[in-house]
Amino acid sequence: MTTNETLARRWLASKHWGGWRVGMVDTCGRVNVAPSGMDALGESMGLPDLDHPGTRAFLLEDVRRAWGDAVYWMSGPGGHHVVKCGYQWFNEGKRVGNGLTEAEALVAALEAAPGE
């Protein structure tokens, strides 16, 4: 299993842990990530924790610097369920846009990430 596959599996597993598995971009441009598998993913990206209360927080600009503009996470009112890859949105388990599931989109994004 590649590093990208391992990270993707860890990210997918985090949705069963009861914590956020995605981040919320706040008004300060931070991506807030509550304790979950995303902690390890953020650390693997070498991003600083801004110590936002109750969450891990990363500057959106740092996320984009590490991953490019193609990837960041958001949380919707119905739950934590979307990932943005390029200009396509992927809802859990559904094939939309260019036909990728969000898991496939994440793996593709990881493979394109600098340093990988």
Give each language-model segment a name.
Residues R9, G19, L47, R65, ...:
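Short amphipathic alpha-helical "recognition" segments used for binding
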